[in-house]
Amino acid sequence: MKGFSLIPFVLTQSPDGYLHVGADSTAVFGLYKDVFEEGIAEGVNNSNPLQDIFKPTKVDYKGGKGHTFEAHVGRNPSPMFVSEDGAFAGAGAQRHINGTVNVRKMMARLRLTQEAMDDSVSSEASWKSSKKDEMTRIIDDIAKREEFALSTDGKGVFCLLQGDPGTSSTTIEVDSPGNIAGSSFGNRFLQKGMFLAAINPASGTIRAGISKVVDVNEDGTDYTAAAVTDTDWADNDYLVQAANGSVTDTLDTAYNKAYHGLPSLIDDGTNWATYFEIQRSLAPSYKSYVVSSAGALATDAMQRTADVLYQKLGGEVTRLLMHPSVRREFLKLTEADRRYAPASSDRKQSDPGTVAFKKPGGDVSMGEVPVTPIRTLGLDQVYFLDENRMSAKQYVAEPGRFVDEDGSILVRDGVGDSARHAFEAWWFARKENFIGNPAVCARWDGVTGQTLVVVPEL
């Protein structure tokens, strides 16, 4: 009809059950699109402050039987004051010993199906290529494991079993993270998906059974296993990484294969009696000054340690390292002096804090020596470093790369009946950390008084 038009409308159902004219968000929901923020949010912590601070000289590892070093560890005892025509001491000799450094190895791998790679190539279909993402981020994961190694003693121990786990529960209690004695935060180095082997600490042999970590519990004291553990597992067994759930030999675990870290390099023989083939008990210059039960922090005790290093080999402390919880105890030492100190920007206001509040990962100082917090260090430790004289080195046979000797980084997964349309990439490195003069450094264990907040590192 002329002058008349039809206007379409939509009937929508209201909460009372009746249909009404008009469109609401429910009616047009099918038209809506997902709105995505730009980029991928980073949900893990990729900073490695200990590797940033502890920067050893890189040494090209030549192979063969390892790098042999010689050390002068004893004097000729014959110098003697004598009278005219008197007898004097018999001939003595200088004392030298040899040690040998061999590198250790770390490997990692990733797996991608053909579809995972193909369907993420286009920026229209994926935020990032899955191949690029996996191959880039695994380098961050490797660096994180190296940070763990530098904070521990080279045994590759994540933690110790706390008590007999029994066979009635999949909740496994642990303590002494990183094989550093302590009852708190035993699971701090565990990750979901890991396979764990139990090592008898007395013999170094593997216990029967492998445990898979399905959850790392937030209280810091335990982990949830995929199944109950073997009856062979016992209190204070070392828990180390195993290659898979079928491992029966220590060869296929990380036990005694990690790069050596500060607890074994700066040591008196407690953690590592034989230092690169040198018996520390026979060579005091390779024994660090270690206080096993330091107790509460005190400036006098810290000065005493600095004096010991100076008296022994002329050492001069250039840096202190400690966990943030221990650093908070250090800050308390000067709390009374700061309480009424004026803020630097406003003389009318007081500032009871320090620069550590503004930058928790930054340095404060002790006698102009930087005090650096390192989150992966032992929870009750302090390290006194003479960075100028300690002669820190890292022997490097391979700094790290993907295996490509057969002409390709990506290799087919499986053959025959086990073949899958997927590809793997393997990464490896061969290194070892070394300190040439450990006696100019010191370590405290057993610091007390700190309040530990259990915060799993992402």
Question: Where on the chain are the PLM-derived regions?
Answer:
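Core alpha/beta structural scaffold of self-assembling particle/tube/pore-forming proteins
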Residues: 2-80, 92-458
